[in-house]
């Protein structure tokens, strides 16, 4: 064959392209399983960190298998809800929501042209009573997301962990890298009746002598990262707003001290009455 003509050049180039494409596809497929496993373990470690079972650094040292084992040991139940706070379906306890899945649900919550269906957002309840929910939104340069854990009362924040794709190192990236920023959320009680469930603002709320916030739901914004702080604030407001009806409905009711359902969730007295008040009247 004449190697100097155009036909040879075209055939040769086509073969090279096909071979290289096949090799790239093979490598990509070979790595896909490992990438998915790493992503799942990372997501779980974020949830465990928010729920105060350890630090992100500690989970990174443990390895994927140990992280999954810890999660299996601590998780109690998982399910999805709609915006009315009603359960849609139970989730396999091994199921987690990747940032890509959170992005899709973010579109569904907000509505508009990118909506793919009705919102179906996850709730993760651990055996110690903490409830963890995700948040997702836009930072300055890319998406930001994270997890917020609540105590049994479903009002008080037990912990939080945030992550990002490409925020500025030393500035916006502090939502992930600065534990003191995440620690500010602990003990706060978001306002589920307001559009501003949390407010991340410069200066935050006034503090007492021990550095504790004197006003609930106000967090000090990161200095030099106004756009990232604002984006995270909007993400938290959007997602916790989407969970508002669930939290308000599932929060433990204030029963009398002698009620057998004291401290339990909203389904505790379903189908029966708490008659302690009537007993007290008879006495």
Question: Where are the regions a protein language model picked out?
Answer:
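Cys/His-rich microdomains that often coordinate metals
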Residues: 263
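Flexible, solvent-exposed loop/hinge segments and secondary-structure transition points
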Residues: 2-260, 274-283
